[in-house]
From Swiss-Prot:
E.C. designation(s): 4.2.3.5
Functional note: This reaction introduces a second double bond into the aromatic ring system.
Chain positions recorded as NADP(+) binding sites: R41, R47
Complex formation: Homotetramer.
BP-aspect Gene Ontology terms: amino acid biosynthetic process; aromatic amino acid family biosynthetic process; chorismate biosynthetic process
GO molecular function list: chorismate synthase activity; FMN binding
Keywords tagged on the record: Amino-acid biosynthesis, Aromatic amino acid biosynthesis, FAD, Flavoprotein, FMN, Lyase, NADP
Reactions catalysed according to its record: 5-O-(1-carboxyvinyl)-3-phosphoshikimate = chorismate + phosphate
Keyword NAD attributed: no
Annotated positions binding FMN: R127, A128, S129, Q247, A248, G291, K306, P307, I308, P309, T310, R332
The protein's name: Chorismate synthase
SUPFAM superfamilies named in the record: Chorismate synthase, AroC (SSF103263)
GO cellular component, one term: cytosol
Length: 381
């Protein structure tokens, strides 16, 4: 069994819900760790007013007993406190309020309304909103729990806000991770964070928004997770697809993937072996992936987030109802959400890694999966 899930819910609806299937029985779930990731997603310099309203927490409804997975589908919900302020506008039982027709460039509003034959883009934007990533993060926390049991850890770091970008080539150390988690910009360099805050403040003052980039890392992965056999089984393709499925992510880089101007001997990673360490590399330009499979080095992927298209200083658009020129409608939004996106990035990467590991090692009980991973690691040494 591999992992799969479905989610439902609107940004200002009663709740975001998910059903996940495929987790082996006996996995210990730390509910506080799940809620901690939800709180991490709410943090970040440049966030909007919504995060002052919500206090996100996951309510588990099925698939666990006494903090352990049972092997049955897991159901969970993240409730929207802000629904109380929107219940007359966003309700399964009635339609109210002014129609949203001043569609916003950069959003799903126009294409979604035309595709589904809607005269009110509210039905599009409520589902397309990045608010849905709250339940994504809760699902990712479950995947992290499975990965941790198998010796794999996932973390992230913001590496760019606006044009100011850094290129760390290794996962953060424990001390750096502590600094990252303490930072309102999810970075371990306070001088750099101060520069970034100034950029965010400048965009806020002009009624704009600003994007950036983040790295996601995974350590402890064995060699050979993923496959070279078919394109849809290549782990790099799956990770890129998962990250590009996150709202506002426009590009993904694996390792030093954009540095293709280097000659080959400066781009690839020489292979070494010794009995104690097994196979190893002294560089990690590939970012832990070769030929669609993990190569035993730390995974490193970078995702690029566009500036949020909802802005106080709006762009020109067309009214969906009249086809007349107008200004895009403003909805409460963030100036910068890159730190939050990094936490979402962790979640989707963790999910894909957990799925790929279960594909390879199988098992209906966690202990079966763990033993299979250990036996494989011993074989390839």
């Amino acid at each position: 069994m591999t992992l799969r899930y479905l989610t439902a819910g609107e940004s200002h609806g009663p709740a975001l819900v998910a059903i996940a299937e495929g987790f082996p029985a006996g996995l210990a779930v730390d509910f506080e760790a799940v809620d901690r990731d939800l709180r991490r997603r709410q943090k970040g310099y440049g966030r909007g007013g919504r995060m002052k309203i919500e206090t996100d927490a996951a309510q588990f409804l099925a698939g666990l007993r006494g903090g352990l997975t049972t092997g049955a589908p897991i159901a969970l919900a993240v409730w929207n406190k802000d629904h109380e302020n929107w219940k007359d506008l966003v309700s399964p039982y009635a339609r109210g309020g002014k129609k949203f027709t001043q569609v916003r460039p950069g959003h799903a509003d126009l294409a979604g309304a035309l595709k589904y034959g809607l005269d009110d883009a509210r039905d599009v934007l409520e589902r397309a909103s990045a608010r849905s990533t709250a339940v994504t993060v809760a699902l990712g926390a479950l995947a992290k729990a499975l990965l941790s049991t198998l010796g794999v850890e996932v973390c992230s770091r913001v590496v760019a806000i606006g044009p100011r970008e850094i290129r760390p080539d290794a996962p953060p150390t424990p001390a750096q991770r502590d600094a990252i988690e303490a930072s309102d910009l999810h970075v371990d360099d306070e001088a750099l964070a101060a520069e970034w805050r100034a950029l965010i403040d400048a965009e806020k003052a002009r009624g704009g928004s600003i994007g950036g980039a983040f790295d996601v890392y995974a350590t402890g992965l064995p060699i050979g997770v993923g496959s070279h056999v078919h394109p849809d089984r290549r782990l790099d393709a799956r990770l890129a697809g998962a990250l590009c499925g996150v709202q506002a992510i426009r590009a993904v880089e694996i390792g030093d993937g954009t540095q293709v101007g280097r000659p080959g001997y400066e781009f690839h990673d020489a292979i070494h072996h010794d009995p104690a360490r097994g196979f190893w590399r002294d560089t990690n330009r590939a970012g832990g992936l070769e030929g669609g499979m993990t190569d035993g080095m730390p995974l490193r992927v970078r995702a690029y987030m566009k500036p949020i298209p909802t802005m106080l200083h709006p762009l020109a658009t067309v009214d969906l109802a009249t086809r007349a020129a107008t200004q895009a409608r403003y909805e409460r939004s963030d100036v910068c959400a890159v730190p939050a996106a990094a936490v979402v990035g962790e979640a989707v990467v963790a999910w894909e890694l957990a799925n790929a590991l279960l594909e390879k090692f199988g098992g209906d009980a966690v202990e079966d999966v763990r033993r299979a991973v250990e036996a494989y690691a011993a074989r390839i040494r």
